[in-house]
Amino acid sequence: MLRTPLWATASLLAAAISLAGCGEDKAPAEQAAAPQTQSEPAASAPDTLNSEAAQAVVKHYADMAHAIFSDAHGTALKLQEAIDALIAEPTDATLQAAKEAWLAARVPYMQTEVFRFGNPVVDDWEGQLNAWPLDEGLIDYVEGDYQHALGNPGATANIIANQEVQIGEDKIDVSQITGELLASLNELAGSEANVATGYHAIEFLLWGQDLNGTNPGAGQRPVSDFIDGEGCTGGNCDRRRTYLKVATDLLVSDLEEMVGQWEAGVAGNYRASLEAESAENGLRKMFFGMGSLSLGELAGERMKVALEANSTEDEHDCFSDNTHNSHFFNAKGIRNIYLGEYLRTDGSTLTGPSLASLVEGVSPEIDSDLKTNLETTEAKMQVLVASANDGEAFDQLIAPDNSEGQEKVRAAIAALVAQTASIEQAAAALGIKDLNPDTADHEF
């Protein structure tokens, strides 16, 4: 069913701002019916889109994808080096260095996610790298009262502690921890909470469970969990070290594969097929990626779900308490695409033909509105970052008794919803109608 464009509903922001936490039962908040309003007409689309200019924008989009995935791969290589150092000599210093490398690796990766929606090669590949939330008992030891997905037979499988795991009537040999084995265990028994690979599996192995709930503090895994021989805590330190090494190597390999998909001048890769399509199709993918990440994924899955359920289990980087940064750089990725700009990890800035230049040529007002909304979203995300830097992380903001903190999250969600409305208007201005960004079944 086609969804009414967001910009046509005058009550949009009021509905978003009225979001409220729902307590521990995780029931969705009741949504007030939006009053019927007169739809505002979209700006007249150009009779013919300048194909050459549009194709240049699509080409630069591919250049940006290659650059950002390359930076994600480069920071993953540094993470790999840090984890190798931790395994070689487990100390508080090498564990801290590995954590810092993981945090640095999240910065470019989160800016890649805007390419996920509209580009099947990214969406089909992404789950092995960034699936969440995960039932960490699949991987390693957990507290006996840890919360996990109901009915998940793998929730306490503990691959690290066992040579085989029992799932229903099936026994799975996990004696040799390899990348192929771990990849095969993702969504084990049909449960999306069974995540054996990617950034969040590595995050859990570095930080351990965050047992603080909505109180201050992240996970506190002791470095002794990685000691070989005498002094090992948590048991099975050799297998924990192997798991961490294998998961990291797989992450690096997966990112290298995606860099290749966006390499220029390679016959048969995804970039070649994208550039062979019409420029209009390319622009649609760009706008759809921006709108879907903005609305269904970031505002919905990553923020609204956690807020409404007051659920620390549903925050994105839950073991490290890095959620504020992941949200900020998701939003930054959306802005990158519209402006055609990306600040690389080496400090250089990649610029080129942009959607903004195309929209400005048709409707300076719509272009200005979207730029304003992008700036507003970034400012609201910066509030979350500043809060975490001041000692109040995302999981504390969504606590049931923290009305002031919840309001900060609601304001960011409202900004994302308004931003998505402007994205739809900008697309329509270029003749791209019925964009219908993915809502992930959320109502705003």
Q: Which residues make up each language-model segment?
A:
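Bacterial signal peptide processing site
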Residues: 22-26
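Intrinsically disordered, low-complexity segments enriched in small/polar and acidic residues
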Residues: 30-33, 37-39
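Bacterial N-terminal signal peptides that target proteins for export
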Residues: 1-10
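Mature extracytoplasmic or organellar-lumen-exposed domains after removal of signal/transit peptides
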Residues: 43-444
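Bacterial Sec-type N-terminal signal peptides, specifically the leucine/valine-rich hydrophobic h-region
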Residues: 16-19
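Flavin (primarily FAD) cofactor-binding/catalytic cores of flavoenzymes
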Residues: 13
